[in-house]
Amino acid sequence: MINIKVVIIIFLSGFYFISNAQSIIGEWETFDDLTGDKLSVVEIYNINDIYFGKITHLFEDSLDSVCDQCEDGDYNKPIIGLVIIKNLIKDDDEYNEGTILDPNNGKSYKCYMELIGTNKLKLRGYIGFSILGRTQYWQRKI
C-alpha cells in the first residue's frame, strides 16, 4: 500500500509546479531587439504582492558593468543585481502600474507585462501612453 505521506507530497508538488508555471515569478532571458542575441537574465520576484525584477546575469561583455547613465540611487550601481522592474501589480492576467529601467540609457519607463503561455513574457515599456513604446518578449529560463 502506498504511504499516505508520499501521496500528499506528490499531490502538493503538482500544485506547486502548476502555480509556478502560471506566474511571472522566476528567471527570464532577455534578447536584443535587432539581433535576437541573449542579453541578460532577469529574476522576477514578489514582495507583498508587488513584483520586481533584477538582472542576475549578463551574456555580453560589451555591456557596462555599472549603470553610469542611471540617476539618483542607481547611479554607478553594478548592472548585475540592479533592480530594473519596480512596483508591478497583478491585475487579472496583466501586471500593471510598474516601471522598467533601461540600464543602457538610464531612463525609466512605465511598463506592463503579460504572461503568454507558460514560458513567454510580453513586456511593454512606454512613455505616457502605451502606444508610444516598445514591446519585448522574454523567454523563461529553463
Task: Please state what every model-predicted region is.
Residues 30-32, 37-102, 108-109:
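Central antiparallel beta-sheet cores of small beta-barrel/beta-sandwich binding domains
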Residues 1-23:
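Bacterial Sec-dependent N-terminal signal peptides
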Residues 46, 90, 115-116, 140:
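Generic beta-strand structural signal
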Residues 33-35, 103, 114, 128-129:
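Short polar/acidic secondary-structure junctions
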Residues 24-37, 136-141:
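K/E-rich alpha-helical interaction surfaces of small helical-bundle regulatory domains
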Residues 22-27, 91-98, 119-122:
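Short, hydrophobic/aromatic-rich segments at coil-to-beta transitions
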Residues 118-120, 127-142:
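Edge beta-strand at a domain terminus
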Residues 103-119:
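C-terminal/domain-terminus segments
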